[in-house]
Amino acid sequence: MQHVKIYLSTAPVVATIWFGLLAGLLIEINRFFPDALLFPFP
């Protein structure tokens, strides 16, 4: 179990999980608020 924790805490694994979550969040925001870059909020 110790080796699994060490593996999951390495930079490539953490970066992959982080960028995957960030991409999913941006996709969901873009789904509910499309064209947010073209029409700025008042």
UniProtKB/Swiss-Prot annotation:
Listed Pfam families: PSI_PsaJ
Gene3D superfamilies recorded: Single helix bin
Topology versus the membrane: Single-pass membrane protein
Keyword Isomerase included in the entry's annotation: no
Keywords: Chloroplast, Membrane, Photosynthesis, Photosystem I, Plastid, Thylakoid, Transmembrane, Transmembrane helix
InterPro entries reported for this sequence: PSI_PsaJ (IPR002615), PSI_PsaJ_sf (IPR036062)
Membrane-spanning residues: 7-27
Superkingdom of origin organism: Eukaryota
Family, similarity comment: Belongs to the PsaJ family.
HAMAP family: PSI_PsaJ (MF_00522)
Descriptive protein name: Photosystem I reaction center subunit IX
